[in-house]
């Protein structure tokens, strides 16, 4: 996606025309009104044990057949959540790692790193070590299904991997970082683009204009020129996945703030990381969770080893917080939150 990412930034720029820490003894929230606030749990420790601890702090048991949705990472991307980090949590819930194929290719010479069909995706999954620890399921390997969407201003349904029907509960285990198109990637991105099949990704990225993936046409202004439409489509699709699992056994959300490049794990050769690792946050509200992470980045100070400037610039350039704002507007969650430290 190296060449594609550079092209997309040009297209979307046209279309879109400290380490300060939360005080663990006080509430850190977007609004002083204590009503209708979500709890966001925080640990500054990033470790296998910390992931289990923050899962338990939520007080929601993962029941039945548990899907753990991650990004397996493009082949040469070094920043994805490593299996060694997440293994204790996945084993704790007897979970299956779930993913879907992508909707883009990489530049010449990087074809081995692609994940746009199951054959090459499985090679990357094995190379990144996931099959050494867990059962893994590419949910759109064989089929896809449509699930209902509440907010239909852009997309009329969400096209997701067909194997989603095999699971009762989802843990959205998200790597928080930048994203070339969304500005940032967190819970809302992993729920929407992450759970969508290749065709579903095209449908969301094009704001409902393309239902059958055509990579030669998708990444052109005709299909991805509506930046806010794309962000609103992501929010709608995230709500669809959340509603799907809430009608089953449930869903929870965990954001890991480490290796925070301005580029997503879908970028084969991401920009260097300029931010220090921060911690792990978790919530039963994906909107509050992403808002808390963005606020943490906003509150970072520039030091010799920590510089949020590029990530904040990318979020602003791509209008990234609009996804959070729209998700709140359509009733997916609230941007008001209270930080609860578990350290």
Show where each model-derived region lies:
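C-terminal motif of bacterial Sec signal peptides marking the signal peptidase cleavage site
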Residues: 13-16
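Bacterial lipoprotein signal-peptidase II cleavage site
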Residues: 18-25
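Acidic/polar, low-complexity intrinsically disordered N-terminal segments immediately downstream
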Residues: 25-34
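Extended, low-polarity segments enriched in aliphatic/aromatic residues
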Residues: 35-87, 92-343
